[in-house]
Regions:
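Amphipathic, Lys/Arg-enriched alpha-helical "gate/interface" segment within cytosolic domains
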Residues: 2-132
Length: 132
């Protein structure tokens, strides 16, 4: 069944934050995700999260209102001090969408077809090895 809110899991181990997205996200789903990230960030000193890894294996899509909300969210990412975002298990549609979202950003954005490809570049990421 189509559920437009989406589900997510967040784990942070400074300087990394890990997000796992599942399902389809509309405006409300992106708002819940944003609030979850802000809450997670509040558990650490400001600007300690520098790298974000996003698992899109079970991610389906964004609605148009969800995309607008996501673009607004990422506009504030620079203020949070993120230096790099890595997307794992990305398909061509999601890649196109996230490339548009990050188009005018100074944040380094990388796309990996699977976990193994990510680990070739980041072999010491124990969270990914153990949990994804």
């Amino acid at each position: 069944m189509f559920g437009a809110h989406g589900e997510f899991q967040i784990c942070s181990q400074p300087p990394q934050m890990y997000l796992k997205l599942k399902g389809s996200f509309n405006n409300e789903g992106i708002t819940l995700l944003t609030n979850g990230v802000v809450q997670e960030l509040s558990t650490h000193p400001e600007n300690t999260i520098k790298f974000v890894v996003v698992n899109l294996k079970e991610f389906e899509l964004l609605t148009l209102d969800g995309l607008d909300s996501l673009e607004a969210y990422f506009a504030g990412v620079k203020e949070r001090g993120y230096q790099r975002v890595d997307y794992i298990n990305i398909n061509i549609i999601a890649k196109n969408m996230f490339e548009k979202v990050w188009k005018n950003s100074d944040v380094e954005v990388n796309f990996y077809k699977d976990t193994e490809s990510y680990l070739l570049v980041h072999p010491s990421d124990s969270y990914i090895k153990q949990n994804w």
